[in-house]
Amino acid sequence: MTHDNKLQVEAIKRGTVIDHIPAQIGFKLLSLFKLTETDQRITIGLNLPSGEMGRKDLIKIENTFLSEDQVDQLALYAPQATVNRIDNYEVVGKSRPSLPERIDNVLVCPNSNCISHAEPVSSSFTVRKRANDIALKCKYCEKEFSHNVVLAN
């Protein structure tokens, strides 16, 4: 790295880096996945330059590691994301999200008549890949929605 190339977001000693998040999605991920419910330091880079994507978001969470299920649930929002496991400032593991069969406790059913809005139950959706889309079926009302409809909710 030359003196002209600087890290735009400070390195972390130990934790998780979620890189290659589409621009404007970083805050949504923080909220949906409750990543801010920690006392650990979180660094967010928004609209950073990216050779591949043009612009990207980035999230770094110190002393916190995502489970495989959490990584896979990112696939709906950031299918090209890379999740890096950091230890002693070095990348010790890399993973990419793959579409899970089910997503629990993250999304909200867009059907206003769904029982999940009135009862204290955790959301649960079955994930199905379609030709040009991803379908999400609510466990409670059994209605199927395009993932874009659920994500916009």
Curated annotation (Swiss-Prot):
The keyword Membrane does not apply. It holds the Pfam family PyrI_C. GO terms for cellular component: aspartate carbamoyltransferase complex. SUPFAM superfamilies: Aspartate carbamoyltransferase, Regulatory-chain, C-terminal domain, Aspartate carbamoyltransferase, Regulatory-chain, N-terminal domain. Its cofactor is Zn(2+). The keyword Zinc applies. Binds 1 zinc ion per subunit. It comes from the Bacteria. One of its GO terms (molecular function) is metal ion binding. Zn(2+) binds at C109, C114, C138, C141. Transmembrane segments: none annotated. GO terms for biological process: 'de novo' pyrimidine nucleobase biosynthetic process; pyrimidine nucleotide biosynthetic process. PANTHER family: ASPARTATE CARBAMOYLTRANSFERASE REGULATORY CHAIN. Contains catalytic and regulatory chains. Involved in allosteric regulation of aspartate carbamoyltransferase. This is Aspartate carbamoyltransferase regulatory chain. It comes from Escherichia coli O7:K1 (strain IAI39 / ExPEC). The lineage of its organism: Bacteria, Pseudomonadati, Pseudomonadota, Gammaproteobacteria, Enterobacterales. The gene is pyrI.
